[in-house]
């Protein structure tokens, strides 16, 4: 529907709590590569506005962080950026101090 009604519009989706296999939980490590690649293609290559408005270089930049944990940045101008965070990695059951944890990697990325 988005492609039909907004073919020339940049659409920047983010994950909600019911957008993964197990509601309110991030993607399990064993499913991560397949899931994020599938969603990346839907959101950034198949939505016509995104495919038209984002350069290949920008899509590659988005894909690097998106594949790591479903988060990304889009620079609209040299002074305005959109940060799309995947907050499913932040709950009371996850240890944020585990090296390689997607939530910690996202925070490290955000600090840069």
Language-model region placement:
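Extended active-site neighborhood of metal-dependent phosphoesterases/phosphodiesterases
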Residues: 2-109
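Short acidic, glycine-rich surface-loop motifs adjacent to enzyme active sites
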Residues: 112
């Amino acid at each position: 529907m988005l492609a039909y009604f907004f073919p020339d519009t940049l659409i920047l989706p983010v994950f909600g709590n019911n957008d993964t296999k197990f509601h309110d939980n991030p993607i399990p490590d064993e499913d991560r590569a397949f899931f994020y690649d599938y969603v990346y293609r839907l959101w950034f290559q198949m939505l016509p506005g995104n495919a038209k408005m984002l350069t290949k270089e920008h899509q590659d930049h988005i894909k690097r962080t998106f594949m790591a944990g479903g988060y990304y940045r889009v620079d609209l101008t040299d002074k305005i950026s959109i940060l799309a965070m995947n907050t499913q990695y932040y709950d009371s059951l996850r240890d944020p101090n585990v090296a390689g944890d997607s939530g910690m990697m996202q925070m490290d990325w955000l600090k840069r």
